[in-house]
Amino acid sequence: MCGIIGYIGPRKASPIIVEGLKRLEYRGYDSAGIATSHEGRILIKKGAGKIDELAKRLNFTDLPGNIGIGHTRWATHGIPNDTNAHPHTDCTGKIVVVHNGIIENFQELKEELLRQGHVFRSDTDTEVIAHLIEENLRITGNFEDAFRLSLLRLRGSFALVVMFADDPERLYIARKDSPLIIGIGNGEMFIASDIPAFLPYTRKAVFLDDGEYGVVSRNGFTVKDIITGKEKRKKVYEIQWTLEMAEKGGYDHFMLKEIFEQPRAVKDAIYGNLEEVPKIAGLLSKYDRIIITGMGTSYHAALVGKYLIQRFGKIPVLVEEASELRYEYEDILDNKTLLIAITQSGETADTVAAMKLAKSKGSKVIGIVNVVGSLATRIADATLYTHAGPEIGVAATKTYTTQLTVLLLLSLELGKMNGVDTTQVENTLPKLPELIDAGLKMNEKIKELAKSLNDRRDFFYIGRGISYPTALEGALKIKEIAYVHAEGLSAGELKHGPLALIEEGVPVIGVAPSGKTFEKMLSNIEEAKARGGFIITVGDDLRLHQVSNVFIRLPKVPEEVSPITYIVPLQLLAYHLAVLKGHNPDRPRNLAKSVTVE
């Protein structure tokens, strides 16, 4: 949530800042702004609205200077308007700040600074930081000391970049519970809240850890501990993503591109984990209790993981949303428990907090993560990467199917350790890309289906057993990007209440692969049809055709594989509904790609 970009080097900063902000739009924002330092002055342009409109109206790229910072704001303190947009300055206009996160003690600090004569222009918590640095600079006369002393006063979460008019060769950065990355170029440096912002210029990155600050010049950087002030050595990561991966490549939207990238992404997830999965499966087999956690789509992947690990690994599994786990499982986590944490970004605030809690209680923590070097990978005892590549669309697609693929690989390895016959499922793995492609070939049919459903106000997705999470995920996609009410339900729950909502013409989407719950699922679908539901089914058994208004037939696969292949038509349905309604599926309202605040 929110985006930060900073640049220092030989080039004009403002075009690079604007380009970086555009690459961070998927994080969600309501206003944007940039600042540069030039000839001893801080120059700022900012406002509420979208970057393209602001850049044109305010001529962002006209700002001179070879050092600059930019920000896309998601409002937390203060309404979205021009004044509350970042960057923010102190009283002198010579200190400028951009900040992601929430300063919890900002009101207390603001009152103190007001008593000292500081004048505030905005309602934001961020502006407090600029004035606090101004006050400490007046006392110390040293830029770095003033910066660090100010950081010590802040409570809450922050990723921030500070620029001084009187110190035009350095940017000052800090992180606590919000991501911040240094991009290392050739005689130039970049700061960003996510990798795509500087991907056109460098693939070398350093990830700040919580409680660290840094001083960045065009030729290097130092990173220190906020509390002790001691310098820390940092690992430089080589990012494997290419610039082309983070561009639309001829598709109308990133989401559609990412849906169609799933055959490649799943293949990469399989072959990228051949060595690591056996090691981590061996670790899992030593534990009597496993908890899987995540948020949003990653939580739905966790639910599938529960079915897979229990079925093949014969180990009891609990699944909990990370936002709940960290408050309700404090007395359950111990050194006999293993936690699997699933997070695409590796920076999801609630998931990271749950991982930290588990570690503090002596639990082993395994991460299933997409972004190399992210905070979750540095907290976890071991990490399985999903190898999905950059996912720009806010609604998760390829990162979901690759999470499921990793969980399937892990479960199969556990099954082999337990003497379970995994042959049928293992034989399906090399065919997964073409099986996913079969769903993608339904694109035109699903587009026509979406047209017929465009006026419907309620959708009900039903599934049983391992297909229940697929129903949840299908419903989430509709809600996220088409802004239509949708519920994902366990089909067995229909007659316990939800059936009262089924009436003539209400779409009911049944996720019904062949397997041990199919007969029951068929009965549940017939119940919904008898109440007038418009029945759409996804499955392989031709009996579904007889009870369906629309039957989306997919190749028959082992039930354990079906969550990977059956979600594809549901992703396409959500996408086409969103486009038909005139919504941008890449940037749904009120949502952000990475939820980095609690």
UniProtKB/Swiss-Prot annotation:
Catalyzed chemical reaction(s): D-fructose 6-phosphate + L-glutamine = D-glucosamine 6-phosphate + L-glutamate
Subcellular location: Cytoplasm
Any Gene Ontology biological process: fructose 6-phosphate metabolic process
Cited function: Catalyzes the first step in hexosamine metabolism, converting fructose-6P into glucosamine-6P using glutamine as a nitrogen source.
Identification of the protein by name: Glutamine--fructose-6-phosphate aminotransferase [isomerizing]
Residue ranges occupied by any Glutamine amidotransferase type-2 domain in the UniProt entry: 2-219
Alphabetized SUPFAM superfamilies for the sequence: N-terminal nucleophile aminohydrolases (Ntn hydrolases) (SSF56235), SIS domain (SSF53697)
Pfam families: GATase_6, SIS
NCBIfam families: glmS (TIGR01135), PRK00331.1 (NF001484)
Native source organism of the sequence: Pyrococcus abyssi (strain GE5 / Orsay)
CDD domains documented for this protein: GFAT (cd00714), SIS_GlmS_GlmD_1 (cd05008), SIS_GlmS_GlmD_2 (cd05009)
Active-site residues, record numbering mapped to chain: C2 (nucleophile), K593 (for fru-6p isomerization activity)
Top EC class of this enzyme: transferase
UniProt EC number: 2.6.1.16
Gene Ontology CC entries for this record: cytoplasm
Domain SIS positions: 280-420, 449-588
Keywords of this entry: Aminotransferase, Cytoplasm, Glutamine amidotransferase, Repeat, Transferase
Keyword Protein biosynthesis attributed: no
